[in-house]
């Protein structure tokens, strides 16, 4: 089957997922300092990182970094974006890649930003480096049970609850483990209402994940295609958005932010701006590197990207991208009206 046939078949089978589902209701979102209504989010960076440890799930252990050093480096950057108008910061570092919810809570309190953390495991290929060895053979149901427990009881005894599910896949066809992780994310979504944000290298991988969600009766609106800007075929982004998935344009740097503007402008031209999320995917403290390595600031979205969007598409588009869409994506859009599991 060639690429065009694959995409056409996937789109046909996913057509029923074109909306977020019937009678959806917004619920509070868990931040590291407590639940917040989506209407209170304000300007939101939906995909950033404070700290990442690439050692691997079987090598991560306490004491690999000094939290005080991380705070010293991260806090000024958080204060900078708050001055630029940011009010909510979504940290996408998952378990076994350096997730530290107590550190996030300290930074949230010190900066005055609302910060959101996650549950889930990060797949992404055959080596499964960031999934604990003992979990690599587990069925989706047992993986989901772990993530649901974090939602219900809090993470690592902290009482801090996740506001979304983070996972990752490699190229297609998805590995058996990646497929189980996506299915586990679907099961967790059905139990908690948390949206799924998946590090996804290609449009083909995005559509394969949406097919797994469809098989579990999970709507496309419960899925964020992270790093969608890396797909060279813009029509795949269009199709994913038409199905109702969230298409995230991130990875903004000094040498590429104008291309990101063009990708967003392309989505807007097709009436799809309502399914677009944007963020810098910046930071972070690199565990194991001297001084934490090259910690990129988070401000580029506010200082360069959004001003250009304002010039090209207007203030309404800016508000949609940085306030309304993140609130809708994270805001607990439920399949059953009146569901109060949040």
Name these PLM-found stretches:
Residues 1-5:
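Twin-arginine (Tat) signal peptide motif
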Residues 42-46, 56-114, 141-160:
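Alpha-helical scaffold segments that flank or form the walls of functional sites
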